[in-house]
Regions:
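Non-cleavable N-terminal signal-anchor transmembrane helices
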Residues: 1-50
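Conserved alpha-helical segments that form or flank metal/cofactor-binding pockets of metalloenzymes
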Residues: 2-20, 81-109
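Amphipathic, well-ordered alpha-helical segments in soluble domains
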Residues: 26, 54-62, 88, 138-145, ...
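Acidic/His metal-coordination segments adjacent to aromatic residues that form catalytic metal sites
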Residues: 29-49, 109-135, 152
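Helix-loop segments that flank and shape redox-cofactor active sites
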Residues: 35-40, 58-80, 142-158
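Alpha-helical scaffold segments that form or flank carboxylate-/histidine-based iron centers
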Residues: 40-51, 69-88, 131, 156-170
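Hydrophobic/aromatic-lined pockets within catalytic cores
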Residues: 67-70, 86-90, 97-101, 147-154, ...
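Internal, conserved structured core segments that host functional sites
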Residues: 120-173
């Protein structure tokens, strides 16, 4: 049975909304087959797809430095980090797909400019120090933000964030 997303014109909307909010208040996770307000679903798609886009676009500046990293060890660290960032994007695209949007639609929205990604990745990484700054400041801030997201109310996003946070913390230590 397909999930029905709640819209205010539904006759039982207010009752379902009250139960939905009570579940969140109790700390329960909302799962893909559960009833949810349409606005909640739309905001999750916007937020998760932006996060996924940021992971994928975010690997580009570091990926460009793989061949120019100063040591073999640093090259290996960058390769692993870029690979993980691509994986993070995939986890997040999958979480968004559970809300009924296709990966193709998300990528089309990104390429058309309708969807966004973190603008920090628009700045050039002209030196190896720029890569260090990304690793220290940008990844450090992301870990703080993403740790909170691991506690979010939507189960697939929360579980993806638990895994992503563990990997991000590992990279931050390198």
């Amino acid at each position: 049975m397909p999930v029905k997303y709640g819209v205010p014109s539904d006759p039982d909307y207010n009752e379902r909304l009250a139960e939905f909010e009570a579940r969140i208040h109790r700390g329960e996770k909302i799962e893909p087959g559960d009833w949810m307000p349409e606005e909640y679903r739309r905001q999750l798609i916007r937020m998760i797809s932006q996060h996924a886009h940021s992971e994928v676009v975010g690997m580009l500046p570091e990926g460009a430095w793989i061949t120019r990293a100063p040591t073999l060890k640093r090259k290996m660290i960058l390769v692993a980090k870029v690979q993980d960032e691509a994986g993070h994007g995939q986890y997040l695209y999958h979480a968004a797909e559970t809300l009924g949007i296709s990966r193709e639609a998300m990528l089309e929205a990104l390429l058309s400019g309708k969807a966004k990604y973190s603008s920090i990745f628009n700045y050039p990484t002209l030196t190896w120090a720029d890569i260090g700054t990304i690793g220290w400041l940008v990844d450090g801030a992301a870990i703080k933000n993403q740790t909170m997201l691991a506690q979010c109310s939507y189960g697939p996003y929360s579980r993806a964030m638990v895994r992503i946070c563990a990997e991000e913390t590992f990279h931050h230590k390198q």
